[in-house]
Amino acid sequence: HSDLPSGVYDPAQA
């Protein structure tokens, strides 16, 4: 996961 909050679309996880 990136520095984005959980639940938000994360391109690094896509």
From Swiss-Prot:
Report disulfide bridges, numbered on this chain.
none
The record lists the catalysed reaction(s) as:
2 superoxide + 2 H(+) = H2O2 + O2
Location within or outside the cell: Cytoplasm
Q: Which UniProt keywords apply?
A: Antioxidant, Cytoplasm, Metal-binding, Nickel, Oxidoreductase
Q: What is its main location?
A: cytoplasm
Cellular component per GO?
A: cytoplasm
| Keyword Ribosomal protein assigned | no
What enzyme class is recorded for this protein? oxidoreductase
What are its E.C. numbers?
1.15.1.1
Question: In the UniProt record, does the keyword Metal-binding occur?
Answer: yes
For molecular function, the Gene Ontology terms on record are:
metal ion binding; superoxide dismutase activity
Cofactor(s) for this protein? Ni(2+)
Family statement: Belongs to the nickel superoxide dismutase family.
How does this chain assemble?
A: Homohexamer.
**UniProt-recorded name of the protein:** Superoxide dismutase [Ni]
Q: Which organism is it from?
A: Streptomyces griseus
Q: What is the lineage of its organism?
A: Bacteria, Bacillati, Actinomycetota, Actinomycetes, Kitasatosporales
